[in-house]
C-alpha cells in the first residue's frame, strides 16, 4: 500500500473536475466518482509485470486550496516494488497539468 498526498492552490471542485485526466494517465479502468464524499476509485489492469492495483483518490479542502490524496493497493501480492508510488505520482502529475497548476508540497 502506498499513499501520496499533495496540496494545490486551487479549490477542491477544480481538482475534482480534472480527476478523469489522472485516471486516463494511469490507464485506469472502471472509474467510480462519488462527488458528495470527494472520493473516486479505479483500478489498473494486469500486465506481464503486474497483477494490477486498486487506486483510491480523495479530494478535500485545505488551507489555501485543496489536498489530493492517492492510495494504491495491490490486487494480489505482497510487494509492489515501487509500482504504487509511480502510479500515484503519475496520477497526481496528470491532475496538476489538467488543472493548470503545480503541487505546493
Sequence positions of predicted segments:
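Ser/Thr-rich, low-complexity intrinsically disordered terminal regions
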Residues: 1-105
Amino acid at each position: 500500500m502506498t499513499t501520496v498526498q499533495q496540496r494545490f492552490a486551487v479549490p477542491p471542485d477544480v481538482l475534482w473536475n480534472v480527476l478523469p485526466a489522472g485516471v486516463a494517465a494511469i490507464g485506469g479502468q472502471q472509474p467510480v466518482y462519488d462527488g458528495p464524499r470527494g472520493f473516486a476509485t479505479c483500478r489498473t489492469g494486469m500486465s506481464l509485470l503486474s497483477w494490477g492495483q486498486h487506486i483510491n483518490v480523495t479530494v478535500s479542502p485545505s488551507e489555501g486550496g485543496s489536498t489530493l490524496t492517492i492510495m494504491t493497493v495491490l490486487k494480489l501480492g505482497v510487494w509492489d516494488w515501487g509500482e504504487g508510488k509511480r502510479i500515484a505520482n503519475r496520477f497526481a502529475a496528470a491532475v496538476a497539468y489538467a488543472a493548470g497548476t503545480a503541487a505546493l508540497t
